[in-house]
A protein has these predicted regions:
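Reductase modules of NAD(P)H-dependent flavoproteins
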Residues: 25-26, 30, 35-75, 104, ...
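Gly/Ser/Thr-rich beta-alpha loop segments that engage phosphate groups in nucleotides
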Residues: 4, 90, 94, 119, ...
Length: 230
């Protein structure tokens, strides 16, 4: 029974968006994992998979089974000259790091705009050095940051979208892609609502027309609004 339990504990399976391009650093896969830790009825709890990766995996000493599941529905534009707006707060930044690496390797000329955020700049600015380097080089044309626990005002990515609504509309109206990755319960819904509001205001549409434009034309017909939410 003890052996069976031990084996069961090792059969942990979870899915993560890959945070690296296979062409950028061949032979490696990078993940962006948020450790789940919380207190329940005065007992400290840790997520099975994230706790295993954080607390029990010894670097270069632990073998982990990896199963790749390629997606054909959350990919870069086939035309490298197309602009891309990426909204990925928290660990939602993962695929966009991979996207930017790939666009860098490809020499794509399309503009890149990243909306990122988390609690604080000091504690959760993931891949800061890379992002700032890409911004300096011009690979990352625009980089908007939202910190929800820094200062007196809570700022989220959808607030920065509203602030940049007119320019977002210009990118989309010009054929740009719009990507969202991360929390589906709150963030993705708020971003979706904000995108519809932006299209209504700056695309001269009624609320119903904007909703149809986003949910039918962008998402289903042209597939320029792509989501990886969890």
């Amino acid at each position: 029974h003890g052996k069976f339990r031990r084996q069961r504990q090792m059969c942990i399976r979870d899915s993560y968006s890959i945070a690296s391009s296979p062409d950028y650093e061949p032979g490696t896969v990078h993940l962006t994992v948020g450790i789940v830790r919380y207190n329940h009825h005065d007992r400290d709890k840790t997520g099975l998979c994230t706790g295993f990766l954080a607390d029990r995996c010894q670097v270069e000493e632990t073998d982990i089974g990896v199963f790749m599941s390629p997606t054909r529905s959350f990919v870069l534009p086939s035309d490298g000259s197309v602009d891309a707006i990426m909204v990925g707060p928290g660990t939602g930044i993962a695929p966009f790091r991979a996207f930017l690496q790939q666009r860098d390797i490809n020499g794509d000329t399309g503009r890149n705009w990243l909306f990122f955020g988390d609690w604080t700049e000091e504690g959760e600015y993931y891949y800061r050095d890379e992002m700032e380097s890409w911004k300096e080089r011009g690979l990352l044309d625009k980089h908007d940051l939202a910190w929800s626990r820094q200062g007196s005002e809570k700022v989220y990515v959808q607030h920065l979208m509203k602030k940049n609504g007119e320019e977002i509309w210009k990118w989309i109206d010009g054929g740009g892609y719009f990507y969202v990755c991360g929390d589906k319960n709150y963030m993705a819904k708020d971003v979706h609502t904000t995108l519809i509001e932006i299209c209504a205001e700056f695309g001269s549409m009624t609320p119903d027309e904007a909703k149809d434009f986003v949910e039918t034309k962008l998402m289903k017909t042209e597939k320029r609004y792509l989501r990886d939410v969890y």
